[in-house]
Amino acid sequence: MNSFTTKQIVATGIGAAVFIILSRFAAIPTGVPNTSIETAYAFLAFMAVLFGPITAGLIGLIGHALKDAILYGSPWWSWVIVSGFVGLGIGLIANRIRLEEGGLTTKKIILFNATQAVVQAIGWIVIAPVLDILIYAEPANKVFVQGAVAATSNILTVGVIGTLLLVTYAKTRSQAGSLKREA
């Protein structure tokens, strides 16, 4: 079993801080109460592919919990849990994409977007509303609308900005086997 490396610990701390900043200053209200278009999830998805499920899950959990505590006075745990779930779920494909090796193919981009769409749909349309009802006794009609809006906006945001982050980063990496020894 791999141990948690110093690089992953640093990535978790910096990632959580960036998540908070993006959630605070780069979010666009949707008109649905307590629901915004969040660029932080594009960053979370990028970190998930770069560092894997544990680091990304922690970034989502810690970043969202601290953001809620700073902005609202206390975390809204049902959505904090889903942020961790989203990071963890997307991070599960990190070994299949291998972003550090460069060579981000169309197939890998499709895998990334299919995965993030499924994970976010499950998280925001199912898990978050059900936990809102169970933990906070919120009205079902309200939380399922919030969940659907969050899912749609986050899937689109990650699909556009997250994909751009992956493509841009992959261009900075040398492809495995691309260097040849001169005679």
UniProtKB/Swiss-Prot annotation:
GO cellular component: plasma membrane
Compartments, as annotated in UniProt: Cell membrane
InterPro entries per record: ECF_substrate-spec-like (IPR009825), UPF0397 (IPR022914)
Pfam (any one): ECF-ribofla_trS
Record-linked Gene3D superfamilies: 1.10.1760.20
Transmembrane regions listed in the UniProt entry: 9-29, 42-62, 74-94, 117-137, 147-167
Keywords: Cell membrane, Membrane, Transmembrane, Transmembrane helix
Source domain of life: Bacteria
Membrane topology summary: Multi-pass membrane protein
Family under the similarity heading: Belongs to the UPF0397 family.
UniProt-listed NCBIfam families: PRK13661.1 (NF010182)
This protein's name: UPF0397 protein EAT1b_2102
Native organism: Exiguobacterium sp. (strain ATCC BAA-1283 / AT1b)
Species lineage: Bacteria, Bacillati, Bacillota, Bacilli, Bacillales
